[in-house]
Amino acid sequence: MEAEVDKLELMFQKADSDLDYLQYRLEYEVKTNHPHSAGEKNAVTVLKELSAIKSRYQALCARFKAVSVEQKETKSCICATLNKTMTMIQELQKQTNLELTLLTEEEKAATEPLKSHMPD
């Protein structure tokens, strides 16, 4: 999941860079090719709209980062709770002299993905 988040963040950074480049190219084209043309007003409007889009994009990136941080915190909390629960179960089994049963293949398969998210 973290790899996907990192990939999305890189995509957002590239899109931001692309928007900067497009704005620069548009400004350059307007200045060099149409310094006093009647269409200049429309080009300026386009540049203003591009700036507004960039601002909205940056706000979206900020919200995305906040969601990403919250998602990581939630995942850590869930993993910690699961670890604590598993430890408590093992302690209860020892205290009550219950036989510790080995996990079935299905249970082992279910715990493998969880292990990758749990701290050592």
Curated annotation (Swiss-Prot):
Q: What's one GO-annotated cellular component?
A: spindle microtubule
Show the Gene3D superfamilies listed in the entry: 6.10.250.1380
Q: Where in the cell is it found?
A: Cytoplasm, Cytoskeleton, Spindle; Chromosome, Centromere, Kinetochore; Cytoplasm, Cytoskeleton, Microtubule organizing center, Centrosome
Family from the record = Belongs to the SKA2 family.
What is the name attached to this protein's record?
SKA complex subunit 2
Give the GO biological process terms.
attachment of mitotic spindle microtubules to kinetochore; cell division; establishment of meiotic spindle orientation; mitotic metaphase chromosome alignment; mitotic sister chromatid segregation; regulation of microtubule polymerization or depolymerization; spindle assembly involved in female meiosis
Q: How does it assemble?
A: Component of the SKA complex, composed of SKA1, SKA2 and SKA3. The SKA complex is a homodimer organized around a central W-shaped coiled-coil structure, formed by the interacting domains of SKA1, SKA2, and SKA3, each end of the 'W' is extended further by the C-terminal microtubule-binding domains of SKA1 and SKA3; the complex forms extended structures on microtubules. May interact with NR3C1; the relevance of such interaction remains unclear in vivo. Interacts with the MIS12 complex subunit DSN1.
| The organism of origin for this protein | Mus musculus
Instruction: Please give the Gene Ontology molecular function terms for this protein.
Output: microtubule binding
